[in-house]
Amino acid sequence: MMKRLLSMAAIAVAVAASGTELKDLKLKAKTDKANPIDYKVGETIRFDFFLDGVTELPAEAKEPLYVIWKREGDDGITVVGTNGISLAKGCSMETSLSVPGIIRVDAQLVGNDYKIFDSVQRTRNDKGIGVRGGAGAETEKMKLSTKEPEDFDAFWAEAKAKLAAIPVKAKRIEATPDRLKGKMKVYAVEIDCFGPRPATGWLFIPENAKEKSLSACAQFDGYNGNEFKVPQVPEWIPTNRITLCLNAHGYEMVGHDEQYYKDYGDKVNGVAPGAPKRMMYALEPSDYDNPRETYFYYMAMRVMRAYDYLKTLPEWDGKNLEASGGSQGGLQTMWAAGLVDGLTAARPEVTWGCDLGNSLREGGPLISNTWGIPHADGAFYFDAALHAKRVPATCKVEITRLGLGDLACPPRGVLLSYYNMKCPVSAKLVQGSTHGYVPPAPNQTFTISNY
């Protein structure tokens, strides 16, 4: 015990002397080409690994150090390897793809005992000093796996007609927090909608805004699983536009305690007595037996109704109508881009629900499966890559982040949504970015666009 205490004390002294902590040490990666998807089938793809974040190594990570890496690809090939690395000199691995598609590389820094530095919590789900990145070859030739329903457009035309039959009526309750008084008016809004729940959310309107003076944007939330809590007014919202932060579920925003939201979540997720059992909402194949009754159907109705309401606001300039959101919010953003008349700009981030029919999930490599949403014919009506085909030329789309290491919303599907768009579109490729993590600069990024 005394030896262990002395060892810990020695490390503490070393850290204090150097000013370097283990959590500051980063393993990063980049490809030899600036554009990491600018490779040909069969061409050598080189990944360069390097250490960053410190000027000298912390006491817990003295050389010799190694990188243990695993390469997976849409070609079904998995390769593992180990390379030595130092702070002064990185290391590299080379690979290639035999088919148009994506390569993913997972790498971990280890010491001379070949154990990861598991005291470092890199993200909520990842321990160690590691990096997950990717590259692509002839990705423009990848084929969408989702089989487009023959009645896709008729399905959504019918949905719009159902929604149009419900008058656009709303009630607002002012909920402006002290920090925004004098700058913005904030309202808890509830808008009549087709389906079991209204469209609800936080509406922000700049103080003293004049008629027809402002653009309007709907912002959409990510997937919250079983975390249903009392809604809070967002901390930061642009003060030069109208913003509706739409709640994904349509529950009431004010006037309830934690139990109301817990009960709602229990019902949605199959925990409440009598509720259909499921892991979490929208993730069971049986949810899509009737696509007109699935959770996403009513969520999409609320997305469209949000814009019906925004268009009625006297402060809206009548021209600029936008959408933004990440993950599930990115999926909703793409629904809006494909379904809402008059949308002028869409900014999805790490878009969920692209290429839901991915054939690679059946006995093949799993690197390109979108997380959660089942491979079910009824789910294909909600595929973001199919809605991407319907975005009009009058709407400009900016995919603000495409994580090359994203497992939940993998780059293959998001790229397929990009290639399906005929409108002006760009996408920022971020090396080492997983679903909820972006490496600090310097880091490899590259923006692709069709304009």
Where are these regions (language model features)?
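Hydrophobic h-region of N-terminal signal peptides that target proteins for export
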Residues: 9-18
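The feature captures the conserved acid-bearing segment of alpha/beta-hydrolase catalytic domains
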Residues: 360-420
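Gly/Ser-rich "nucleophile elbow"/oxyanion-hole loop immediately N-terminal to the catalytic nucleophile
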Residues: 208, 276-327
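Short beta-strand element of the alpha/beta-hydrolase
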Residues: 201-205, 212-223
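Cap/lid segment of the alpha/beta-hydrolase catalytic domain
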Residues: 225-301, 358-365
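N-terminal targeting or regulatory segments adjacent to alpha/beta-hydrolase or S9 domains
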Residues: 20-183
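Hydrolase active-site cap/lid region
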Residues: 259, 326, 330-377, 429, ...
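C-terminal catalytic histidine-bearing segment of alpha/beta-hydrolase fold enzymes
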Residues: 356, 408-411, 415-451
